[in-house]
Amino acid sequence: MLSRRIIPCLDVRDGRVVKGVKFRDHIDMGDIVELALRYRAQGADELVFYDIGASPEGRSVDYTWVERVARLIDIPFCVAGGIGDVETARAVLHAGADKISINSPALGRPQLISELADAFGVQCVVVGIDSIREEDGQWRVRRYTGDPSKTQALPMRTLDWVAEAQRLGAGEIVLNCMDNDGVRRGYDIAQLRQVRALCRVPLIASGGAGEMQHFADVFDQADVDGALAASVFHSGAIPIPELKRFLRAQQIEVRDGQ
């Protein structure tokens, strides 16, 4: 496996970075570009930006901040939010994003994954999956999680959707474990291991990081390709240079950074 990736996640609403707990109660965390520059300087491997209101509000992402970020950072970044067709994806990539991520629009029209893969190559197409464990013990997907008033519970099992997304051309999967989001108690290793067993493309863990050991655990125990986190990076609780030194000390290969 290639070096593991450390990926700050920036949820965007009204031109600002916000963060919630379990996709609820978002608070302002700062300016998009300022945070992007901070993470670039600290040695982040890439960035993910989620315009969390775009899909629930039926609009596309705001290209102006995508262009601002692209002008100022030289690490890869992925943009998600309201990308429901090839032309919108093309505009986001033209604005400077390296990858686009789709979530709710793909649940409504799965063929979108194939259309994007055919147009831009699988390396550009990330499928984000918001997953929650239900009372019967099954993990199932949620839609429109950026707006609590519009969130939809779907009958589709998470594992089935992972398999289908791959078949259609997803080049990477980001698994957002909603039960763990923002609570800082560790990644959902059990769920990630099940997804890893059937996921042939790069798998990124999201939701639950609270301390450096949580990153080591998810790499060692779930064999994910990257770990995404937000609140511990935004708050400064885990500086990325220290995290990379910690992981190297545990014989986990990470990319060079500070």
Curated annotation (Swiss-Prot):
GO terms for molecular function: imidazoleglycerol-phosphate synthase activity; lyase activity. It catalyses: 5-[(5-phospho-1-deoxy-D-ribulos-1-ylimino)methylamino]-1-(5-phospho-beta-D-ribosyl)imidazole-4-carboxamide + L-glutamine = D-erythro-1-(imidazol-4-yl)glycerol 3-phosphate + 5-amino-1-(5-phospho-beta-D-ribosyl)imidazole-4-carboxamide + L-glutamate + H(+). The keyword Transferase does not apply. GO terms for biological process: L-histidine biosynthetic process. InterPro entries: Aldolase_TIM, His_biosynth, HisF, IGPS_HisA/HisF, RibuloseP-bd_barrel. The active site is at 11, 130. The keyword Manganese does not apply. It comes from the Bacteria. Signal peptide: none annotated. One of its GO terms (cellular component) is cytoplasm. Its EC number is 4.3.2.10. It is found in: Cytoplasm. Pathway: Amino-acid biosynthesis; L-histidine biosynthesis; L-histidine from 5-phospho-alpha-D-ribose 1-diphosphate: step 5/9. Keywords: Amino-acid biosynthesis, Cytoplasm, Histidine biosynthesis, Lyase. NCBIfam families: hisF (TIGR00735). IGPS catalyzes the conversion of PRFAR and glutamine to IGP, AICAR and glutamate. The HisF subunit catalyzes the cyclization activity that produces IGP and AICAR from PRFAR using the ammonia provided by the HisH subunit. Belongs to the HisA/HisF family. HAMAP family: HisF. Heterodimer of HisH and HisF. This is Imidazole glycerol phosphate synthase subunit HisF. The lineage of its organism: Bacteria, Pseudomonadati, Pseudomonadota, Gammaproteobacteria, Lysobacterales.
